């Protein structure tokens, strides 16, 4: 446990308040301390998953080895009880995660800002994502868009575009099916998500972009309902005429938007913002 102070802004800690001297005493605790009664079966599940992956056949070794290293580091980061070691542990977890390229993806505690209005704390999170073969054609179109954007920024030959080209060229993107999620993913679900957020990891390893067709379809229905509430004759003049399609929006609007984050994220151009 750490006194409130330098550890306050550590993203992978939780602040506990307890009564003391007629007031409150605030303590900063890593996940492993705050969730000490919850984590043991979780850590055991990680050990089981690693053991199972080590037993896979040789034909799967290309994807198994990076996943083993990732899960081992993920477990290590969850179990870390020293506040001053948390950033190093989770940064390495991001890097190990970026090395996993299989169609089955696990996503850890990686988004900041969505679960904490102060944008200080990392929301505990976990989700399982499958590259959705239902959308093979659309995923191929997303890859074509990505290739065109890479070609454009390579042609610019500016220092700003050059700084982001490693991340952009290493980007993988696609429409994923997400059968299981927990933690802050239950509070807010993404139509499109571009991660990791650490700029050094992004520059070295690239970016992963996940598109969720189910969530995008839900957003389209919400917009339709709002349009009908606001505009007269909206169904015949707008909705029936244009027939908004969620998957088309993912491919031709959200994909380009999220891929663009890989090269021109706000964190990349902060020195140019006055």
Which sequence ranges carry the predicted segments?
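Generic detector of intrinsically disordered, low-complexity, polar/charged segments
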Residues: 19-20, 100, 257
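Post-HEXXH active-site segment of zinc metalloproteases
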Residues: 265-273
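Contiguous, non-catalytic segments that form substrate-binding/exosite surfaces or channel walls
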Residues: 59-238, 246
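Alpha-helix capping and helix-loop boundary segments enriched in small/acidic/polar residues
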Residues: 238-250, 273
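Hydrophobic transmembrane signal anchors and adjacent membrane-proximal interface regions, especially
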Residues: 14-17, 26-28, 33, 128, ...
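Active-site recognition of the HExxH zinc-binding catalytic motif
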Residues: 249-266
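Noncatalytic N-terminal accessory/assembly modules of large enzymes
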Residues: 1-81
């Amino acid at each position: 446990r750490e006194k409130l102070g330098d550890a306050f802004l550590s993203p992978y800690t939780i602040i506990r308040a307890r009564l003391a001297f007629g007031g409150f005493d605030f303590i900063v605790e890593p996940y492993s301390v705050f969730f000490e009664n919850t984590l043991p079966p979780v850590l055991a599940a990680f050990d089981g998953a690693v053991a199972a992956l080590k037993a896979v056949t040789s034909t799967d070794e290309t994807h198994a080895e990076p996943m083993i290293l990732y899960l081992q580091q993920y477990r290590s980061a969850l179990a870390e009880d020293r506040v001053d070691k948390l950033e190093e542990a989770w940064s390495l977890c991001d890097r190990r995660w970026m090395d996993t390229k299989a169609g089955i993806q696990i996503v850890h505690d990686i988004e900041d800002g969505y679960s904490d209005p102060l944008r200080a704390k990392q929301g505990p999170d976990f989700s399982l994502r499958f590259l959705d073969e239902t959308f093979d054609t659309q995923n191929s179109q997303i890859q074509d868009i990505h290739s065109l954007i890479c070609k454009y920024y390579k042609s610019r030959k500016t220092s700003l575009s050059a700084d982001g080209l490693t991340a952009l060229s290493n980007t993988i993107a696609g429409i994923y099916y997400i059968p299981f999620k927990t933690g802050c993913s239950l509070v807010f679900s993404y139509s499109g998500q571009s991660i990791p957020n650490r700029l050094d990891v992004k520059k070295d390893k690239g970016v992963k972009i996940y598109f969720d067709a189910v969530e995008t379809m839900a957003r389209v229905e919400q917009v339709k309902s709002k349009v009908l509430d606001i505009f007269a004759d909206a169904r015949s003049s707008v909705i029936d005429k244009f027939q908004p399609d969620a998957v088309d929006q993912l491919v031709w609007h959200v994909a380009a938007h999220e891929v663009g984050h890989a090269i021109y994220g706000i964190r990349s151009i902060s020195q140019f913002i006055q």
